[in-house]
């Protein structure tokens, strides 16, 4: 099994962590109106999508409920459905814009599972390509991202503005 090395994330890992606070980073972003600076890609009724500032690969994004909860148990069925619908929309937008060979989509619940923001549930969507476990991160402590976050965010916002499937009544593209 190949490993996906992401040593550039060490900056995030080693950064001082604030103790649990009333408003998580994701809640602060949700309440901000500066979507461009925060790399917010789409906002739905109960959740939003944003690019990860410390990505494992280009296009690594997260789907976050507006409600700050540590796990799925804090969401209503409607909120959970909205979260998964936006995840699907983002996967489809990434497919159209970046044409990956596959995806890792998942959730880290709890510190031992790798959660970086314990108090706020979020879903990771990580596009993958054949051979994306290259030597650059291992030998040069360098990640190769094909384009700047702002440029990629603009492309993904445009893709998310289009329905993934025009016949799907549950596709909430605006």
Segments the model singles out, each with a brief description of its role:
Residues 52-54, 66-68, 108-110:
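Histidine- and/or cysteine-centered catalytic micro-motif in compact active-site loops
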Residues 62-84, 139-145:
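Short histidine-centered catalytic/ligand-binding loop motif
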Residues 60-65, 114-134:
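Histidine-centered divalent-metal-coordination microenvironment in nucleic-acid enzymes
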Residues 3-19, 128-174:
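C-terminal helix-cap and adjacent tail motif
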Residues 1-58, 63-64, 170-174:
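Active-site microenvironments that recognize anionic phosphate/pyrophosphate groups
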Residues 76-100, 150-157:
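Long, well-ordered alpha-helical scaffolding segments within enzyme catalytic domains
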Residues 98-111:
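A short glycine-rich, hydrophobically flanked beta-strand micro-motif that places a catalytic Asp/Glu
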